[in-house]
């Protein structure tokens, strides 16, 4: 809407609200500022249209919040006279103080008779006279204060006689304004404007263009696929000029002579009446031409550009050189060209058969358009634009004419300068055609013609304009410069086309076309024969026949989108001077400055003339699940993957050398003479890093580096690493031995003896429990860090006293024998006072301060001659330097009995390094940097021990929080350490309830294996489970479970009743360590858990049978009298908890005391309801004093048997669960015994790995060790595995 000239500057700067008024139909505003002929002007408004000032006094501004002061406030009286529009309808007009008239637009409503909220110019009396347009039709006009007039577009209806629904200005006259009652699509479809196309017109144009030009240029947009590819139209031997010319003529003829063309909002940008500017003068009349800024349709780009003075000033700078053009065919690639000096910001590069033929580009500048022909790898020619004089007589619309001229290969493009929306429509790439319609006939415009000449010259030339500007080729592209080489503007001639799509947390690779440089690429040689191509890539041709977009049945998150319309295959391609062949490794463009490495497995051309290659991606360490934790890895190491996809050929950068090396633990590939190397495959499923045995690339150009190939074959290494009879296990952080016990039981079923040879834990009671159940295990009550130092010292001792045969034998000299001499018999009786102790033997070794003397270091435990064993002492090794024979004897004996492991002589290292710093029950944990917490340092020590001992297999267990805290940095660190040591690795999340337990406890497990061993898979679940809480979404691919749609046969989930219903009734005061069974087992689980050690291990040593077995540790933790009184008040029903105690009310799920009741007091004087239940989780928790129920699954077994914060009460007995009941929930057999106090035994059970889970893992380990589990991520357990004994499963296991 055109505002009066005298506007208040502060209000004029008010922000626009383009969404204040709702509308039921698409808006398309068409405003034309014009000056009528004087002879046709009405007497009421005879002054000429004056030049619009440039000082901003007047602003041509579109707003929904505009208003003017009411006539009452300014002493004026607005009048509206009836005007006949071109459609013969009366239109209301308002006359302002100076006689100027303003068209009323129903899209904008005045508020309280005010114009646009920015003007205080009163509306005075005055009539509105009829104006004759140049088209001979009457149009209603509103006269503004400076005499300018604005036509009202009849496309927008009035609303109840008000200005734009927000105005209270009265509308007078005989008829008032007419309101359109029809809002139908047909009504909109038939509507037209003096400068627009109806939908029918557009449909005719589009149909004509599609029939004649679609075969020449096919527009594709792959944004929906996450990839926008650069596409060159297929080259065909068709006269595109003739096609285009005939298309335009047929389009023009299809328009009715009496029908005015209207721009559709669906194809053109809307006009935004916002601000005014003097853009230049017409040669004919010398009148000012006002222009409007433009709004980008939200249907086209999703953004809105609001006009302002700065925008119009920039347009003014272009002067008469500004041209508008309509494009016949939608452009395929658009790149914004930056503005500098006198260059229009709207200059863009357009490419499409509407203006140019195949392999050509169109450059649009303020003074014309230039067509650029590309032949092979060089620019064929650049044409010269020729400009003609500007004639603005009778200008109402912009038109386009492309016709043959006398010059061969020449095209003439005619443009007219009126409205910038035509140019913006061209730049938006929307199909449109617009002709000038006046008095029933189409008019050809000859205003600013540009003749494009095509030459056969091979030399690139600069473009010289008539005004002295030149287009020269510069290093970064092209530049437009003025005559004095000032104000050079770089022209970005390339379109950023990239293919990026990520879903979930899957690591994928996509190639991205570079934004500021176009690659010159083409295939070399003749296409491969159809027979050879179909033989090598048969699947692609079959895919083409099925017209499918994806190979096979791909999931929605599959990044391997396949191009199906293949035409032919090639063996070589050339990109920017680099020749690529099938099987070559290459750098490939990525996002921003990132480059990727991949192997070319296919070159092909599509039926659209597009050039593609198929790449097999190779990952860097930081591209995998390890992410930032892999920054210290070898930068040249890559990981093979099976991920492939199709990308445009111009994404290739250059060739690179990649070698495959033989995998080996501790490999130091310093002598590899290549850019990159790889020895493992990476798969996102279960974050698997696996030895690459048989590369699956279609073009195998892999080479092995001779400098890093081991001198011994893999078979010989495998034989040396194989363990005769048994696989020795080191159990770190062993606790009572839950993990190693389960591994032994499961591996036995698979036919492998996994023996726990060594165990280390800092808890004395836990070490005693493990020793009680594994008497042949070397159990060390040490810290893991001290144990690592001990291993290093033990290795030195073995090398000195066992492996070094040339070592000189020292004479054992005890302290007293050193003092003895041949004259000792003549010594006096006083010598007996200086008696010295004699070392009889050394019985143990340690590192640290076991005797709490404050002295750290390597120590031996000395048994003194003549003293009892309980009087043995720890002595520093340096104080026993004269006891070399005793040390040699101890080391030799210890080496034979394997009291300590040596590097390379350990079969399995398993353990769960404690991470109290990240435990969910630790309220003071460091969630941002968990590795900096000293309580989380044990995971580093665990990996240090693995790195030193180099076992064949590694199994680490930990809480799920290592994948939650700090984006899973602890889990990524552990995986990174294994991979950096050249171990194969796999990470999974397993739930105890899935393996036959009535407990929902999830833990993270990480497998590791040396390169020449099979990486153990994870066992698939055997039971359904009742889910209690969620798992990390980022690691959802690591949850061990059946895939969707995979057939499964799961047993029913176990509940509490299945596990403990057969145990005898005991009270809170029960203190017997052994009890007889009072009933027979009732479920399969109970029968299995009562099995003897012989039944589960197959060992003949244990002679105990079920009849003589007693029930151990079926006694509860004794709760105090006050808590026992509270427990007795908890009802014996499902869901009962402390809220059932008297004197409580619940409001909004929060518990508080009932003020109407006196608190119940216990005999001790304390209240029945303790105060901590109100502060625990702000009184919202239901866990304090909660009873479990028979049909429930226990969330997890805790280390502290407290009922204050956990649901731990027996369903029908007034006590907490007993030690044996907790052990059963963890899968410990009834024969397994515990040592220590009652609290310590609960703690051992709560810290242990569920035996049923480790048993399933042991089976997977045994199958991998035997070579029966190849490269699968998962393995299916035998039927009834979870609750069957060793003899029962022998018939189903392959041997």
Curated annotation (Swiss-Prot):
SUPFAM superfamilies: Chromo domain-like (SSF54160), S-adenosyl-L-methionine-dependent methyltransferases (SSF53335). It catalyses: a 2'-deoxycytidine in DNA + S-adenosyl-L-methionine = a 5-methyl-2'-deoxycytidine in DNA + S-adenosyl-L-homocysteine + H(+). GO terms for molecular function: chromatin binding; DNA (cytosine-5-)-methyltransferase activity; DNA binding; SUMO binding. Residues 837-902 form the Chromo domain. GO terms for cellular component: nucleus. Keywords: Chromatin regulator, DNA-binding, Methyltransferase, Nucleus, S-adenosyl-L-methionine, Transcription, Transcription regulation, Transferase. Residues 727-1268 form the SAM-dependent MTase C5-type domain. It is found in: Nucleus. Residues 61-72 have a biased composition (Polar residues). The keyword Lipid metabolism does not apply. Its EC number is 2.1.1.37. It holds the Pfam family BAH. One of its GO terms (biological process) is DNA methylation-dependent constitutive heterochromatin formation. Residues 1-23, 61-91, 249-287, 814-835 are annotated as: Disordered. Signal peptide: none annotated. The keyword Nucleus applies. The active site is at residue 915. May be involved in the CpXpG methylation and in gene silencing. Belongs to the class I-like SAM-binding methyltransferase superfamily. C5-methyltransferase family. This is DNA (cytosine-5)-methyltransferase CMT2. It comes from Arabidopsis thaliana (Mouse-ear cress). The lineage of its organism: Eukaryota, Viridiplantae, Streptophyta, Embryophyta, Tracheophyta.
